[in-house]
UniProtKB/Swiss-Prot annotation:
Keywords: Cell cycle, Cell division, Cell membrane, Cell shape, Cell wall biogenesis/degradation, Glycosyltransferase, Membrane, Peptidoglycan synthesis, Transferase. This is UDP-N-acetylglucosamine--N-acetylmuramyl-(pentapeptide) pyrophosphoryl-undecaprenol N-acetylglucosamine transferase. UDP-N-acetyl-alpha-D-glucosamine binds at residues 11-13, 164, 194, 289. Cell wall formation. Catalyzes the transfer of a GlcNAc subunit on undecaprenyl-pyrophosphoryl-MurNAc-pentapeptide (lipid intermediate I) to form undecaprenyl-pyrophosphoryl-MurNAc-(pentapeptide)GlcNAc (lipid intermediate II). Pfam families: Glyco_tran_28_C, Glyco_transf_28. Its EC number is 2.4.1.227. GO terms for molecular function: UDP-N-acetyl-D-glucosamine:N-acetylmuramoyl-L-alanyl-D-glutamyl-meso-2,6-diaminopimelyl-D-alanyl-D-alanine-diphosphoundecaprenol 4-beta-N-acetylglucosaminlytransferase activity; undecaprenyldiphospho-muramoylpentapeptide beta-N-acetylglucosaminyltransferase activity. It comes from Clostridium botulinum (strain Kyoto / Type A2). It is a peripheral membrane protein. One of its GO terms (cellular component) is plasma membrane.
Length: 354
């Protein structure tokens, strides 16, 4: 039996793509172990899946001045020795790294143990952890065609991003039942990210009458963002957060408004959902969502509305255009070869564990 050690953490976005690979890797006969941080979000998620978890020390990597920048390198160094010991004991055939600060010591340790490493980068430009880890990687899987030039050493492989299988197995009727919709209006799903989006919530509710004249609305608005005054509004179903229900709600929707994080837009691509992307502005991000959205717009998969241009008339104009041209977007997405990241990545893993 082949053995793989996976690593990635710091945020859910560095863990869920790993989970998407797990069922296929198990089917292929791989024994799976996981190295993560001591107190990171990844520990709870991974242990819930019944995967053996090895915690190591790791310092956070920062691009800005902080007093912890003087102590954290020693935590990373400690993590390298801990990971090296784990890898030497477990003897994996390969290491798969999804990024996040905890992966740097693991990748270095694998390199020191002469174990091949495949990393994955979700965004167009690599994050700091993957930048530091790339010299020690055998290959780096990238999500966007534009990413290839940003990976040094001719190591980039265009694979797309892995999508959880259960997300593709939703039930449309269950989604409609959950929302209580009784008519046949097209359904608009609005996703503001795991924490919701204040600006998107406000513009949607401000234009609720106009939008409801044409669509039923599923609004995932984020924690503490429910509006009690809209609880019984016909055609409007609001949720703070969804988990198991998401596949059914996705399946039920005809159009989607979303932020432009790499994971969610590739989920929309896999599901062939016409979408309007409203990327985070540079005021509140490093600009990666703007680049992600531009790439999908260029490929004909998405329509984009800049946050700075998020006004009443622009929103309705874009929604109407998207719905009228929905089949064009569906056809474009159907031609993509980047909607099967799980297969593309597991094939690469197989190649380096023969």
């Amino acid at each position: 039996m082949k053995k793989i050690i996976m690593t990635g953490g710091g945020t859910a976005g560095h863990v869920t793509p790993n989970l998407a690979l797990v069922p296929e890797l198990k089917k292929l006969g791989y024994e799976i172990k996981y190295i993560g941080s001591i107190e990171g979000i990844e520990r709870k998620i991974i242990e819930k899946e019944g995967i053996e978890y090895f915690p190591i020390s790791s310092g956070k990597l920062r691009r800005y001045f902080d007093l912890k920048n003087f102590s954290d390198p020693f935590k990373v160094l400690k993590g390298v020795f801990q990971a090296k010991k784990i890898i030497k004991r477990e003897k994996p055939d390969i290491v798969f790294s999804k990024g996040g600060f905890v992966t740097v010591p693991v990748v270095i340790a694998a390199h020191l143990n002469k174990i091949p490493v495949i990393a994955h980068e979700s965004d167009i430009t690599p994050g700091l952890a993957n930048k530091l880890a790339t010299p020690y990687c055998t290959r780096v899987c990238v999500t966007f065609p534009e990413s290839v030039k940003h990976i040094k050493g001719d190591k980039a492989v265009l694979t797309g991003t892995p999508i959880r299988r259960e997300l593709l197995e939703g039930n449309k009727l269950e989604g409609i039942k959950l929302c209580g919709f009784k008519d046949n209006k097209p359904i608009l799903l609005i996703i503001g990210g795991s924490l919701g989006s204040k600006i998107i919530n406000e513009i949607v509710r401000k234009n609720l009458d106009n939008i409801l004249s044409k669509f039923n609305i599923i609004h995932i608005c984020g924690k503490s963002n429910l509006d009690e005054n809209l609880e019984n509004r016909k055609g409007y179903a609001q949720f703070e957060y969804v988990n198991e229900e998401l596949p059914d709600l996705m399946k039920a929707s005809d159009l989607v408004i979303s932020r432009a994080g790499a994971n969610v837009i590739y989920e929309l691509l896999a599901l062939k959902k016409p979408n309007l992307l409203i990327p985070l502005s540079k005021k509140s991000s490093r600009g990666d969502q703007i680049l992600n959205a531009a790439s999908f717009e260029k490929s004909g998969y998405s329509l984009v509305l800049k946050e700075e241009e998020l006004e009443d008339k622009n929103l309705m104009k874009k929604l109407n255009y998207l719905y009228e041209n929905r089949n064009v977007y569906i056809n474009n997405m159907s031609k993509s070869k980047m909607d099967n990241g799980v297969k593309n990545i597991t094939e690469l893993i197989k190649k380096y564990t023969k």
